[in-house]
């Protein structure tokens, strides 16, 4: 027996939802016509082959990585990058996803001591005169070092500084996540606590700085630190994690990952549909925050303002590219299910274990 609640959620006879209606994630600033980097196919083949060989992936893992298509993600985020910069972005996306998985569902997700050690060593890579990591013992750390070397060759000095600052924000957020997981003892986190943490762990802060590198943006440190610019960065990060937590909800439930906004709200008494609706409310708040930040942006003068505009474009293309990729990648849905979800805004939950309404 299947029943309909409020015209948008179906449940089975035992009271468990089999589908849920998601927010419209392609409205307002996310309705922009997408662009994809013309170097996508050329760079993808080389980058996929490299990472499979470098991380010694078996055939199954290599196929899984290829279907994830991190090159499409980079191509949508940095459509104007040349082939060299696009390749650096793809390598970075491979690095951050494999690095992040260790903190989400790997050996570091509940071990703050080991997590802090790994974060400390990773941050040390960015220091002047740092020792080169051992490629065989620490392949991800070594890969991060090669990415940093490539960024230093081309990025303006202030953008290099921003690269370091934003990576520290991300890594500090991961450590906070590990500590929260360890100390949670099954107790639900508040919405506010989760948002503060998730804004940093989604990876948007460093990714936006990498887009700035890829597009050869020369943003001054003064402009970077202005509250209006920082708010645009925060909005880009918030849109990305809200959309990611919606699209990845099924994957996270199946994997036992609790770092998901929908799951957090459900532990606080929300139904699945109510949690999705609340995510939509936060998304719409982001759109208002975006325009308020632009309205309060100072006028520095032609040369600085031009770079600020290009940087703000990166703050926008990050969540937009991530959203486009999320609906297509095999990591979450795959192109067929992603297309159907985009058209219907109905997420099928019938293949999940029973979830309390």
From Swiss-Prot:
Domain of life, source organism: Eukaryota
Intervals of motif DDXXE motif: 100-105
Keywords: Lyase, Magnesium, Metal-binding
Cofactor info, note text: Binds 3 Mg(2+) ions per subunit.
The keyword Lyase is annotated on this UniProt entry: yes
List of residues binding Mg(2+) 2: 105
Pathway the protein contributes to: Secondary metabolite biosynthesis; terpenoid biosynthesis
GO biological process: terpenoid biosynthetic process
GO molecular function: metal ion binding; terpene synthase activity
Stretch forming the signal peptide: none
Binding site for Mg(2+) 1: 100, 105
Catalyses which reaction(s): (2E,6E)-farnesyl diphosphate = (+)-eremophilene + diphosphate
A matching Pfam family: Terpene_syn_C_2
Cofactor(s) the record lists: Mg(2+)
Chain positions recorded as Mg(2+) 3 binding sites: 244, 248, 252
Function statement: Catalyzes the conversion of (2E,6E)-farnesyl diphosphate (FPP) to yield the bicyclic sesquiterpene eremophilene via a 1,10-cyclization, which requires the abstraction of the pyrophosphate from FPP to yield the (E,E)-germacradienyl cation. The only accepted substrate is farnesyl diphosphate (FPP).
Domain statement: The Asp-Asp-Xaa-Xaa-Glu (DDXXE) motif is important for the catalytic activity, presumably through binding to Mg(2+).
Matching PANTHER family: BETA-PINACENE SYNTHASE-RELATED, TERPENE SYNTHASE
Protein name (record): (+)-eremophilene synthase
Organism: Gibberella fujikuroi (strain CBS 195.34 / IMI 58289 / NRRL A-6831)
């Amino acid at each position: 027996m299947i029943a309909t609640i409020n015209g948008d959620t179906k449940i089975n006879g035992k009271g468990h939802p089999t589908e849920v209606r998601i927010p419209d994630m392609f409205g307002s600033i996310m309705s922009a016509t997408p662009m994809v980097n013309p170097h996508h196919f050329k760079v993808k083949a080389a980058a996929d082959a490299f990472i499979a060989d470098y991380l010694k992936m078996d055939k199954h893992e290599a196929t899984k990585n290829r279907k994830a298509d991190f090159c499409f993600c980079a191509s949508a985020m940095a459509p104007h990058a040349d082939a060299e910069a696009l390749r650096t972005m793809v390598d970075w996306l491979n690095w951050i996803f494999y690095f992040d998985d260790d903190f989400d569902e790997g050996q570091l997700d509940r071990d703050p001591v080991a997590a802090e050690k790994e974060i400390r060593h990773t941050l040390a890579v960015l220091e002047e005169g740092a020792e080169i990591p051992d490629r065989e013992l620490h392949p991800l750390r070594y890969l991060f070092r090669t990415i940093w070397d490539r960024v230093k060759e081309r990025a303006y000095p202030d953008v290099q500084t921003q690269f370091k600052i934003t990576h520290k924000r991300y890594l500090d957020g991961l450590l906070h996540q590990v500590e929260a997981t360890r100390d949670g003892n099954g107790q639900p986190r508040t919405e506010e606590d989760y948002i503060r943490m998730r804004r940093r762990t989604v990876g948007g802060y460093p990714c936006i700085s990498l887009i700035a590198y890829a597009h050869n943006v020369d943003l001054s440190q003064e402009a970077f630190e202005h509250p209006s610019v920082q708010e645009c960065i925060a909005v880009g990060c918030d849109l990305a994690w809200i959309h990611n937590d919606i699209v990845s909800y099924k994957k996270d439930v199946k994997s036992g990952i609790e770092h998901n906004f929908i799951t957090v709200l459900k532990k606080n008494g929300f139904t699945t549909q109510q949690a999705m609706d609340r995510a939509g409310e936060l998304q719409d708040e982001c759109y208002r925050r975006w325009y308020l930040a632009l309205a309060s942006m100072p006028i520095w003068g032609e040369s600085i303002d031009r770079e600020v505009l290009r940087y703000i474009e990166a703050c926008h293309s990050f969540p937009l590219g991530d959203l486009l990729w999320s609906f297509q990648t095999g990591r979450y849905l795959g192109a067929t299910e992603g297309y159907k979800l985009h058209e219907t805004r109905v997420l099928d939950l019938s293949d999940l274990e029973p979830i309390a309404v």
